[in-house]
Amino acid sequence: MTKYIFVTGGVVSSIGKGIVAASLGRLLKNRGLKVTIQKFDPYINIDPGTMSPYQHGEVYVTDDGAETDLDLGHYERFIDINLNKYSNVTTGKIYSEVLRKERKGEYLGATVQVIPHITDALKEKIKRAATTTDSDVIITEVGGTVGDIESLPFLEALRQMKADVGADNVMYIHTTLLPYLKAAGEMKTKPTQHSVKELRGLGIQPNMLVIRTEQPAGQGIKNKLAQFCDVAPEAVIESLDVDHLYQIPLNLQAQNMDQIVCDHLKLDVPVADMTEWSAMVDKVMNLKKKTKIALVGKYVELPDAYLSVVEALKHSGYVNDTAIDLNWINANEVTPETVTDLLGDADGIIVPGGFGHRGTEGKIEAIRYARENDVPMLGICLGMQLTCVEYARHVLNLEGANSAELDPDTKYPVIDIMRDQIDIEDMGGTLRLGLYPCKLKSGSKTASAYSNQEVVQRRHRHRYEFNNAFRQQFEEAGFVFSGVSPDNRLVEVVELSDKKFFVAAQYHPELQSRPNRPEELYTAFITAAVENSQAH
């Protein structure tokens, strides 16, 4: 029988529910259980694919091409699993499916209501996420906070699950903020009490509290919360602020969180062996070197827009025994006059993805600087496309060369729209999304990074591609197409073999990086940056 764990939040949002859920998932996986995890987002968008990065942060793409919440990146990195389209559910997605069924007459004339039709659809998504992955345990995080009007159907569905599958198969975990008032010199439990009262008013009695605190709460506070919120004192778990996120599973294990969960769900499984994880955390906290990486982006005011990129850089730093000193460079500020001042001390330069014209000329200037000064450079998605544009302009002397996305009237569209995208009008969910194979060129730096594999599978999110009408001209000038689709139609990776490391990929390698298994192209980039640093 599948076990269901539901994680809700109270008092404030952005309290770390996703990290708690992911950490618990890691602990349960290390007990030998097959775990999957999903996120419920109460907003009305179908998915975050068309949302501004300033609103939502990065869009995380799964193997099967779902555009999802960035929390799924945390889930995959912590638990080291590959999620699917059932792992992110929004209000918009549920309502659109229910309304489509209503239009097709599938409800046989019934009045379509929140209960039971919306709640049934939500419960179906929970069960599908478990059955499609054949999981022993599914953890479902509900976005937002208890009390939000948007969350009510989701919480009602969670309440009903207890009756549907039995109390021994369901556990409710509520995460809240435990604020410390410096002037009073004490922690305040009242916000948590009111949050739990609100949750209980909706028919859900939490079995565990996870309290987010800046400093240890003490047993007295835990006992008080246990008494007022009707949970066992040992089931009041602290989630303290830490230096590194990957410490959190160890901190939760030290408080027996996973054992309490297993006892409640009647799971008789071995204790989690976290030896390897602990060794990784110890290494992360004692890195011997520091490497300066310049990230040239257009959304740098909100680092969450590049969350997976940053994590992938860190992961590759771990295996190189180096901390990543990240310098956020606003692409709009990069000009021929400022580029040396902005990038002159960088050991490596990364140019990540994005959409739209703003900042692209600055990115092109950064790529030119990396090429001309032989600074290790990694381009991702739009960064790959602009690498081709830069080379066309400044090496092939194709004046005004550009992407057709950025300049539809360019004389030299070295980047053009994909053929199967030409007649598509909708923006949402219509990109080339998900896992696709990439055939590597033997002897290239890219193939070397991937241990000379012939084919790798990586996740994509794009609508434009390299224009093959220019391929011969590029190749004759020494530009290497080191990764292509198996049918040789789509350019996936480009590089300059005479540079320390000058590689750009159409796909998003960061989406498959893990702290204990860094992505190979990122690792090759950081290795080159470390060597460049030592050569200074």
UniProtKB/Swiss-Prot annotation:
The gene is pyrG. InterPro entries: Class_I_gatase-like (IPR029062), CTP_synthase (IPR004468), CTP_synthase_N (IPR017456), GATASE (IPR017926), GATase1_CTP_Synthase (IPR033828), P-loop_NTPase (IPR027417). CTP binds at S13, D148, I149, E150, K188, T189, K190, P191, T192, Q193, K224. One of its GO terms (biological process) is 'de novo' CTP biosynthetic process. The keyword Ligase applies. Catalyzes the ATP-dependent amination of UTP to CTP with either L-glutamine or ammonia as the source of nitrogen. Regulates intracellular CTP levels through interactions with the four ribonucleotide triphosphates. Its EC number is 6.3.4.2. One of its GO terms (cellular component) is cytosol. This is CTP synthase. Gene3D superfamilies: 3.40.50.880, P-loop containing nucleotide triphosphate hydrolases. ATP binds at S14, I15, G16, K17, G18, I19, D71. It comes from Streptococcus mutans serotype c (strain ATCC 700610 / UA159). Residues 1-267 are annotated as: Amidoligase domain. Keywords: ATP-binding, Glutamine amidotransferase, Ligase, Magnesium, Metal-binding, Nucleotide-binding, Pyrimidine biosynthesis. Mg(2+) binds at D71, E141. Pfam families: CTP_synth_N (PF06418), GATase (PF00117). Homotetramer. The active site is at C381 (nucleophile), H508, E510. Allosterically activated by GTP, when glutamine is the substrate; GTP has no effect on the reaction when ammonia is the substrate. The allosteric effector GTP functions by stabilizing the protein conformation that binds the tetrahedral intermediate(s) formed during glutamine hydrolysis. Inhibited by the product CTP, via allosteric rather than competitive inhibition. It catalyses: UTP + L-glutamine + ATP + H2O = CTP + L-glutamate + ADP + phosphate + 2 H(+); L-glutamine + H2O = L-glutamate + NH4(+); UTP + NH4(+) + ATP = CTP + ADP + phosphate + 2 H(+). Pathway: Pyrimidine metabolism; CTP biosynthesis via de novo pathway; CTP from UDP: step 2/2. Residues 292-535 form the Glutamine amidotransferase type-1 domain. CDD domains: CTPS_N, GATase1_CTP_Synthase. UTP binds at S13, K188, T189, K190, P191, T192, Q193, K224. GO terms for molecular function: ATP binding; CTP synthase activity; glutaminase activity; identical protein binding; metal ion binding. CTPSs have evolved a hybrid strategy for distinguishing between UTP and CTP. The overlapping regions of the product feedback inhibitory and substrate sites recognize a common feature in both compounds, the triphosphate moiety. To differentiate isosteric substrate and product pyrimidine rings, an additional pocket far from the expected kinase/ligase catalytic site, specifically recognizes the cytosine and ribose portions of the product inhibitor.
